[in-house]
Structures are given as structure tokens and as C-alpha cells.
């Protein structure tokens, strides 16, 4: 509930202006509800209009993307780039290619990115972009032509010191390669304008694994500090089968857990013997197939239709790694009833407000997305550093830096929670720690 007058006034203004953007409103309200003790302690934020400014993007770019498919037909999609806040560094955030991409979705992701990037302690502002283009079922040539058309417009708005996009859902190494090539051709320059690049042309080792590994490093540290516990011997329920889910499963198993599920938009796999990550990688990364094929290849595993069913599986730890709002209140209650005591988010905003309420009422250790899945953008920041230095670090060096960053995020979140009288609250702590750094920078730089 919003009780602070300043916060309530600003939120009402956001609703009046952006009432047709439900995902964005949800993200803003979740953050605002936890910022009330922060705003009360810092009256200078109201005087400087920090809340009014932080919820309004510095720039919203929306454009047509016209391209030709393999049959010679002209196709038209929408492209977006939200340059949300540059108070602590150049805009930084991924590109998502998915039919569900709208201005509201990109805006909520960009808003979350401001605080997420702040939490990494690296100098990166918040941004996000994408298109309603769906690469699934498209040939490599069609994906290439779309990426080239998309970058033809985007190239005039980005740069290594201005805005550095990365990948997100359906934007992996293939797409980043096509986008980077087109930027290089148009701008006639070779720079670190994108992250998630191939190792042959400026990418970083451990970038592919970063988000999933980071989720597990965060979870392991939160368990250690708050419960004197670890992944060892735990049963883990994971949703999704993309980059984040796959490498979260891999790292959880390395840390001694047994991962029993993965899913996609059609259904989920239950493997009581533990998910074989190499089979998942072969199906999803190499063959670009559907997860149901796992059951055809791994004896003893089961495929079930309906992705929401994954939350009915018994476990100790749940890592939602698929998409926004995948866990509603009913699903959260099923998780609790099935013994889950830890929920850490790998996807962006995968839990609805009702689900978060269930976690809090039942004493679930809850790690919010903006903190827990910051590993991807953290290693993107490390890739930017390597590009600037014109050198490459080893996998072990990058992985060690990632682990240190995730442990620092837990420590900073808990310190902020304690400072604002909500000891142990990782959600309030993450929002407060991320916000205060950006807010102080905004105050120092004047009204912009």
C-alpha cells in the first residue's frame, strides 16, 4: 500500500499518463511500495523531483522495421528502444525479439534495468529495446535480414559511450552477430557498441553463462547469510529452457542440488533423476527445438502439457527463469504447499504482486529479479571493460568477478534493508540500494 503522500502523488500521475501500460505500472508500484522509508529519510529527493523524473524515460524511440521474407513478401514489425536513465552511465539493457513485445513491456524492463544496473556497482544507466518480431520458425537468412533492417534505424541512436544494447529473449549470439555486422557496415567503425558478441569479435568468456550462474551465486550467498544453508542436497524446480534456465540448472547441479524440471511455452519436463543439461542445450541451443523432445531422448523423464504445471512439482528451491508474471498467486501457493521455501527470480518480474504476497506471508526467502538476475548485465559491463582495454580475461577471471558482484549485491541489499528498518528483506533492500545511488547522482547533476 502506498502511504507516503509524495509517492502516492507521483504514482497517481503515472497511472493517469500511462494507464494503458499494465506491465510498467506493475513494475513502478512494486518499487514505490518499498521506497517509502527511503523517501521519508531523504526529503531532498522530493525537492529535486527525483521520482517524477525516474519514471519518465529520457528518450523513447519507436520505429518501423520493414524486411523481406524468403518468399519475397514484405513484412513489417515494430522496433523499440527506451533510453530510460543515464545518471550513472550510458544506457545499458537488452534487446528482446518476441510477439509479446510492446511499449509497456519494454518500458517496464527499462525501468527495472535502472536499479539492476545500479546494484552491479558498475557505471551503467538503464535502457531496454526489442521488437514484436518472432525468430522462431524463421530461416537464418530471414533473421539476418530482419536484424539488418532493425539495426539500420537503431544505429543512429546507440554508441559505446551512449547506449550499449545486449541480448535478451530470442536475441542470442546469432542475432547479436548480425546486428553488430550491420552497425559496423553503416557506421564504418569497430567499437564495443553491443555486448554478448562472439569471442572472435570482442565478446567475453562467461557471458553466455552469466545470468544463470549469477542467479545461483546470489541464491547460494543469500542462503548462507540468512539461513546458514546452501544448494547442497536440495531439489530445485526451474521454469524455462533458454539461456538463463539452462545455465542456472548447470550451476545449481555443480553446487550440489538436483534440478528436476525445465519448461517452455507449451509444457514442462519432469526428470526425477535430475535434468541432463547437455541434452537441453542440444535441443534448445543447437537444434532450436521444443522441450518435449527431451522426454523422447531421456528414459525416465516425463513431458506434461501446460507450462504452469511446473509449479505443482515438489521441491525446496524454485527459480522462475521463463518470462514476466509466470507465477501468479495460485501457483505461488502451490509452491509453498509443495515444500518450496526459497524463490529466486531468473526471469524479469516473473512473480505477480499476489505471488510475492504469498511468499512474504509464508516466510519464503525471496530474491527479486533486479538483484538476482543482474549477473548478465554485470558481465556485459565486464565485456565493455575488456573492449575498452582491448584485452580478454579468462573464463575463471570473469566468473570470479561475477561471483564477487553477486555476493556484493546480497550484502548491499541486506545493508540497505537494515538501514531502513526492514532487516532481512531482500526486495526492499535491492530497491533501496539501487535507487539511492541513482537518486543521489540525479540530485548532484541538477534538473535534467
Question: Can you name each region flagged by the protein language model?
Answer:
Residues 2-27, 222-223, 334-448:
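Adenosine-phosphate binding glycine-rich loop
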Residues 22-25, 41-48, 121, 158-167, ...:
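Flexible, glycine/charged-enriched surface loops at secondary-structure junctions
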Residues 44-75:
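Structured beta-strand/loop patches that form or line metal/cofactor-binding pockets in enzymes
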Residues 73-114:
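N-terminal cap/recognition module
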Residues 98, 117-232:
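Glycine/serine-rich phosphate-binding loop and adjoining beta1-alpha1 elements at the start
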Residues 203-314:
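Glycine-rich phosphate/diphosphate-binding loop of Rossmann-like nucleotide-binding domains
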Residues 267-366, 371:
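Rossmann-like adenosine-cofactor binding region
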